[in-house]
């Protein structure tokens, strides 16, 4: 039994074995005996032979032929079973614990994106998880979670003057009270209204960084599922124990605390 990490095993299965699925003897070694033959075909036709992914999401190899290893097929089937998995994002999820957030801007944006993802649902569906795993396996790396916090700036007028805001309470036609945010600057007195305040905003969007860290955690959760699923189901391989690293960015937080 060959011992392998779940990541290495999946990479082997998808890049070395499952590419044989759908290759067919008519387009495999019989018709294109080498990579040079493939280059020759390109020179003659002016284009590469078009290929669609096989049932495992892998482009069939022009060179490889024959049947894939039985363990690789088990790996491919396990990844396909991820389509039945449904993931969730808990309330209060904090993918940036290493960032200072004195004005709550990061938390507010994370919650906005979380709510958007929960409503749409496509990024939490098993189909997305299976596709994410296939992509990461083929690239031999997980999603890039590295991110730097953008600057916080005061909301300002076009001339750069910081704007003032204040809250006022009013009543509707039914006598119910509600609060609205209005201009906090008294232009007649040329000074802010009592209780007026400045507001801050992030200088650039962090939506992409939020989704990247969400996908990192999905990738790790999926690896846990696959490692457990394949643990006792292989003929010639043994999956090493796997401990998901859901927050690799936490080490950066610790480094900042010690600095």
Where in this protein do the model-derived segments appear?
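Short, well-ordered alpha-helical segments
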Residues: 129
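N-terminal interaction/assembly modules
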Residues: 1-124, 141-259
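A short pre-motif secondary-structure segment
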Residues: 132-133
């Amino acid at each position: 039994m060959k011992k392998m990490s779940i990541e290495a095993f999946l990479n082997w299965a998808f890049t070395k074995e499952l590419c044989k699925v759908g290759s067919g003897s008519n387009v495999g070694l019989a018709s294109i005996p080498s990579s040079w033959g493939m280059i020759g075909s390109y020179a003659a036709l002016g284009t590469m032979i078009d290929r669609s992914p096989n049932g495992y999401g892998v482009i069939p190899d022009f060179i490889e032929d024959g049947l894939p290893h039985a363990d690789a097929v088990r790996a491919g089937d396990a990844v396909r079973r991820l389509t039945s998995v449904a993931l969730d994002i808990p309330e209060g999820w904090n993918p940036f614990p290493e960032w200072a957030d004195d004005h709550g801007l990061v938390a507010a944006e994370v919650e906005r994106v979380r709510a958007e993802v929960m409503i749409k649902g496509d990024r939490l569906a098993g189909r997305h998880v299976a596709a994410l795993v296939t992509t990461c396996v083929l690239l031999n790396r997980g999603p890039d979670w590295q991110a730097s916090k953008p600057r916080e700036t005061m909301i300002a007028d076009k001339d750069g003057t910081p704007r003032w805001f204040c809250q006022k309470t009013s009543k509707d036609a039914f006598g119910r009270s509600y609060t609205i945010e209005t201009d906090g600057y008294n232009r007649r007195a040329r000074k802010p209204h009592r209780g007026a305040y400045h507001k801050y905003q992030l200088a650039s969007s962090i939506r992409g960084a939020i989704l990247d860290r969400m996908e990192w955690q999905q990738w790790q959760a999926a690896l846990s599922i696959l490692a457990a699923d394949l643990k006792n189901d292989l003929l010639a391989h043994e999956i090493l124990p796997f401990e998901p690293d859901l927050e690799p960015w936490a080490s950066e937080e610790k480094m900042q605390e010690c600095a």
